[in-house]
Amino acid sequence: MKLKTSKELVQEAMDKIKTITPAELKNLKIKNPDAILIDIRDIRELKKTGKIKGAIHMPRGMLEFWLDPESPYYKKDISPEKTKIFYCASNWRSALATQAIQNMGFENVCHVKGGFQAIVDEGFEIEKI
């Protein structure tokens, strides 16, 4: 049995999802201020670096449960219709997260190339948690 590597899984996801640059994120947030920016990093990462101002923290392990209306963990305040933009530290986990919710049926989803630091380098503010 040949197992797929994490790198292969990420590449498969990248081939099926939309990736935007931090500059495109800036334009998207201007054109669509209701778009939800979602940080899927571990809470320890957020405590160390903070998060992008205005982003929602949604731990990767809870993603599918928080977005599933039939789950006891469903978060009603995260509208299924709103555009969702995921980021992590680099862009591997966010690629997998984007593919997962796309597989759930969500349509307006993407992730940010380069992750947290690339977004910060584009001029986005950080807020401590």
Regions found by a protein language model. Name each.
Residues Y87:
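Short, surface-exposed ligand- or partner-binding patches at beta-edge/loop junctions that are enriched
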Residues M1-A35, I43-K84, W92-I129:
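Rhodanese-like catalytic fold shared by cysteine-dependent sulfurtransferases
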Residues I38:
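Active-site flanking residues adjacent to catalytic metal/cofactor-binding acidic residues
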